[in-house]
Amino acid sequence: MVDMSASPSGTSANVSRSIEWFEKAKMFTPGGVNSPVRAFGSVGGQARFIDRAHGSTLIDVDGNEYVDLVCSWGPMLMGHAHPAVLEAVQKTIVDGLSFGAPTIGEVELAQDIINRTSVEEVRLVNSGTEATMSAVRLARGYTQRPKILKFDGCYHGHVDSLLASAGSGVATFALPDSPGITGAQTRDTIVVPYNDIEAVRAAFAEFPGQIACIISEAAAGNMGTVAPQDHFNEHLLAIAHADGALLILDEVMTGFRTSYRGWFGVDKVRADLVTFGKVVSGGLPAAAFGGRAEIMNMLAPQGPVYQAGTLSGNPVAVAAGRASLSAATEEVYRTIDANADRLHGLISDALTREGVAHHIQRASNMLSIRFAEGEGHNFTDMKNADTFRFAPFFHALLDHGVYAPPSVFETWFVSSALTDDDFQKIDDALVPAARAAAAATA
């Protein structure tokens, strides 16, 4: 349980060791973290340093326990330290950590991915960013075209050409979204609103025969959770193919999270290329991209498009990924879906009792909260809400032992490991959290 004694962090939990380690971390690491969202920048307060985890529970360095509704941003389908995954990793590491040569496990993981999705061939890489970067390069190499089209609010890793925000107008050249990215690097990136199929058509009309690919999250999870509307992905595929372009669906987040077959299991759209991450690694650093064989065969050494990686197909990560996919049966997904429905209901009931305008955004078992009436369909909708209510809501949950995503624009993830006791703890924590959200002012 969380120690509710006062602490100098401004929270009601004892987080003295997290404070100590965060101050030390800032001496050696920019901002004290290795990925920005971990710093609690958008919600304020003290980031928790996690010591260990099991099942649905995170335990920080001060001994505080939390019900985990982040699941390492998606991959922990069955909770932390799942016995089958740990056994596979432990069995593999005694034979070596990395060989820089082909292994049987690489072939077997590729087969596992192919058997559950629409892709015909797979290349293993080390991160979701690397997967999307490689897929875009491959699309450009295959089509011999320079431009790419992406959607405002969709995140595809920190690739220079994809880390771009929308400028003005319906179909527009992108503006760099970070210092260090030049206009030249985003000049060939077109950004349009998500779920706006007419904006996509307008972009292709403005740049006929120039767009190599459309890249989109299969279901958006980085502007909050926003599901594709009205057969959006299907229309994207048709528009791309009519112009000779490709469709890349980014399933780094949704792949093997939203169903046994990922988002492909939801809408059955056979994209030309698909990127995977998170679940395919079992929580270790690994990812993949795949697609139609004629496109994938453009990759070196078979074709001219270069892509490589010393640690790609790392045997330990491959073992974890295979074990995770194997253990994630259809029954596991039914449990995850039911748990997401249960969490949805608890959050909505608590906010309704306090009169807080809200909509629970859903994409299968992924969810987030929009603090406004009605469903958000794009990034503008998600920003046009009472986002100021989220920080006090988040901290009340955290102080009562519930670990939610530390940003209103991040997706909540549940595991099959959640118990009735966990849901009771969540329900209890939602009482002060909803009150805090109701009392918040801009």
Swiss-Prot record:
Q: Which reaction does it catalyse?
A: (S)-4-amino-5-oxopentanoate = 5-aminolevulinate
What keywords does the record list, in alphabetical order? Cytoplasm, Isomerase, Porphyrin biosynthesis, Pyridoxal phosphate
Q: Where in the cell is it found?
A: Cytoplasm
**CC terms in the record's Gene Ontology section:** cytoplasm
Q: Annotated Gene Ontology MF terms? A: glutamate-1-semialdehyde 2,1-aminomutase activity; pyridoxal phosphate binding; transaminase activity
Write down the superkingdom of origin. Bacteria
Question: A single GO BP annotation from the record?
Answer: protoporphyrinogen IX biosynthetic process
Instruction: According to the UniProt record, list the residues that bear N6-(pyridoxal phosphate)lysine.
Output: 278
Principal subcellular localization: cytoplasm
Q: What is its EC number?
A: 5.4.3.8
- Similarity annotation: Belongs to the class-III pyridoxal-phosphate-dependent aminotransferase family. HemL subfamily.
Subunit field text = Homodimer.
Name recorded for this polypeptide: Glutamate-1-semialdehyde 2,1-aminomutase
